[in-house]
């Protein structure tokens, strides 16, 4: 600190720090209560309740920040506190965190509050936590009644089958299992299929995180197998095979499969973590290479993930020299998109003006992005990080990009010394645009991309999402080969749409007309008209009609809408249906496998 206070003499400084921590503690208490409630809702099979709980939790953080800011302004006139006291506030806050179980998240909460009160000129480590102050290494809750972060099991003592059964039953889920012995047998067979026979080393053990991970209609057991110097990750999803009866659905034993269920295109898990940094450290051991920012986000601590991401960006900028450039591909009508080639993300800014035929506003587009944030993304919609007042070094901006920014978003720019401050932007994982993937790919790539595209749109419609603009350029291909939607300015709930067939032409003039001969309402959709936009490439057309000929039939869309209107929530699985035990080992299930919906499994990883 440039001017470290020699004496922490300000009572206001201590009171403000304590107030901020009290509001963070309130936030985290609500966060944990949501995870506890998720277990109850899962046991009851209350899927609508789980959806509602997940949506409410997303907004809870901002509500606590807003409440805290209002108290600080009303009781302490926070905007007029002088610089020396603000420095003391931070130091008092650090002192209050020395034995805290969530210090990194509390520091982020401090930043969130300060950013609402202080001018951005104060956004330095003197006043906020640009860098962390409290270490989270080896942090555990050592209170006698507290759950450990993970439990260790030793199969060498009682055998693997008994150990696996104990792992499952220790979670004390209320509904009974249909046939836990059968399911444990499937787990053991899957382990043997994946790894074959392996010699048990003296340190052979299984570590299992103490809390279940809830999302959609599944509860996941997450852990790792330790044997000699090998660390083998696993996740076991538990599902209701029918109301009030549970089963282990599969076991995921490959790192890439775990990375998909923890990916940026899925909604956040609800998981009860007394010490979140310990959970994240554990998850890093089974998904090495996955940024901590993404893991914090996936377990529901998206503000901490956002904070870590920004630190990662600043660190990368200080250790790289390439320039931000306009993103390659077809330019959008609504968003200006740029990227830093050495950094695997894109930066998206809403333009000041939209040319015809776009009829929307900045506020409406921002609401669409919030809709996606709150909605179940099912592995088919990219998560976004939203930032305000992002300062980028001018020397790192390509001249063509600066000209484009000044042309398209002048209202969002401020020049500040050697930096360009962008008042508002979104950041997303960079993907290969699907149109380029199909254009440049082999025949096998085209088949994969088209099949994935159709699956993605069909899964989105079953989740009550109509993408609006379904051109290939609005979808991307992830590094795992998944097709993900990422252009949200025309997104709508399918239940708000009016699915229509194209009326037959009234005469030859109608038939030859390039314009519709029928009225089109603002929420009307005509699936039969999508073909000319999607099937122009002969390779694409052939594969599309092979896998998704029903895509252009309004009946498909209307059937999904009807089920949604009746309150149905379809089953989705963030792994291939062929991995499900009932599909993979049908002989173990006999007649019981007929009722578990295996034939209708949707792949939504």
From Swiss-Prot:
ATP binds at residues 327-333, 348. It holds the Pfam family AceK_kinase. The active site is at residue 383. The keyword Nucleotide-binding applies. One of its GO terms (biological process) is tricarboxylic acid cycle. Its EC number is 2.7.11.5, 3.1.3.-. It catalyses: L-seryl-[isocitrate dehydrogenase] + ATP = O-phospho-L-seryl-[isocitrate dehydrogenase] + ADP + H(+). One of its GO terms (molecular function) is [isocitrate dehydrogenase (NADP+)] kinase activity. It is found in: Cytoplasm. One of its GO terms (cellular component) is cytoplasm. Bifunctional enzyme which can phosphorylate or dephosphorylate isocitrate dehydrogenase (IDH) on a specific serine residue. This is a regulatory mechanism which enables bacteria to bypass the Krebs cycle via the glyoxylate shunt in response to the source of carbon. When bacteria are grown on glucose, IDH is fully active and unphosphorylated, but when grown on acetate or ethanol, the activity of IDH declines drastically concomitant with its phosphorylation. This is Isocitrate dehydrogenase kinase/phosphatase.
């Amino acid at each position: 600190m440039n001017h470290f206070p020699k004496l922490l003499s300000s009572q206001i400084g201590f009171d403000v720090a304590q107030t901020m921590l009290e509001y963070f503690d309130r936030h985290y208490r609500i966060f944990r209560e949501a995870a506890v409630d998720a277990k109850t809702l899962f046991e009851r099979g209350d899927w609508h309740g789980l959806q509602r709980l997940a949506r409410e939790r997303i907004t809870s953080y901002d509500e606590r920040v807003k409440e805290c800011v209002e108290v600080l302004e009303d009781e302490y006139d926070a905007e007029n506190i002088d610089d020396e006291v603000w420095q003391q506030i931070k130091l008092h806050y650090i002192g209050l965190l020395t034995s805290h179980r969530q210090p990194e998240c509390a520091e982020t909460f401090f930043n969130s509050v300060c950013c609402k009160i202080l001018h951005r000129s104060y956004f330095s480590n003197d006043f906020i936590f640009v860098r962390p102050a409290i270490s989270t290494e080896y942090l555990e809750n050592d209170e006698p009644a507290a759950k450990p972060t993970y439990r260790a099991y030793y199969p060498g003592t009682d055998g693997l089958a008994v150990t696996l059964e104990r792992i499952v039953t220790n979670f004390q889920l209320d509904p009974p299992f249909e046939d836990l012995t059968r399911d444990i047998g499937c787990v053991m067979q899957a382990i043997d299929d994946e790894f074959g026979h392996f010699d048990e080393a003296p340190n052979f053990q299984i570590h299992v995180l103490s809390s279940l991970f809830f999302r959609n209609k599944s509860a996941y057991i997450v852990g790792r197998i330790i044997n000699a110097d090998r660390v083998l990750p696993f996740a076991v999803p538990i599902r209701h095979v029918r109301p009030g009866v549970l089963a282990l659905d599969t076991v995921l034993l490959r790192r890439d499969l775990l990375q998909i269920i923890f990916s940026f295109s899925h909604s956040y898990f609800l998981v009860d973590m007394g010490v979140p940094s310990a959970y994240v450290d554990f998850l890093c051991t089974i998904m090495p290479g996955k940024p901590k920012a993404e893991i914090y986000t996936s377990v529901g601590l998206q503000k901490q993930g956002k904070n870590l991401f920004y630190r990662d960006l600043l660190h990368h900028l200080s250790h790289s020299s390439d320039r931000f450039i306009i993103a390659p591909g077809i330019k959008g009508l609504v968003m200006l998109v740029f990227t830093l080639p050495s950094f695997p993300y894109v930066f998206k800014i809403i333009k000041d003006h939209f040319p015809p035929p776009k009829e929307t506003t900045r506020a409406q587009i921002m609401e669409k992005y919030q809709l996606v944030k709150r909605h179940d993304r099912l592995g088919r919609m990219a998560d976004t990080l939203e930032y305000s007042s992002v300062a980028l070094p001018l020397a790192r901006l390509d001249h063509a990009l600066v000209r484009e920014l000044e042309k398209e978003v002048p209202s969002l720019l401020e020049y500040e010394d050697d930096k360009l401050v962008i008042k508002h932007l979104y950041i997303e994982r960079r993907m290969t645009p699907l149109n380029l993937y199909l254009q440049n790919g082999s025949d096998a790539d085209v088949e994969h991309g088209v099949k994935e595209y159709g699956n993605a749109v069909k899964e989105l419609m079953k989740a009550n999402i109509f993408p609006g603009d379904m051109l290939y350029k609005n979808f991307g291909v992830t590094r795992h080969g998944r097709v993900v939607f990422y252009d949200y300015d025309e997104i709508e709930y399918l239940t708000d749409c009016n699915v229509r067939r194209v009326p037959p032409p009234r005469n030859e003039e109608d038939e030859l007309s390039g314009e519709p001969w029928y009225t089109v309402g603002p929420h009307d959709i005509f699936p039969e008209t999508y073909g000319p936009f999607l099937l122009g490439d002969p390779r694409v057309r052939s594969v599309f009609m092979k896998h998704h000929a029903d895509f252009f039939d309004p009946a498909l869309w209307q059937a999904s809408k009807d089920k949604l209107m009746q309150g149905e929530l379809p089953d989705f699985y963030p792994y291939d249906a062929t991995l499900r035990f009932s599909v993979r080992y049908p002989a173990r299930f006999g007649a019981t496998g007929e009722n578990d919906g295996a034939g209708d499994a949707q792949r939504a990883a």
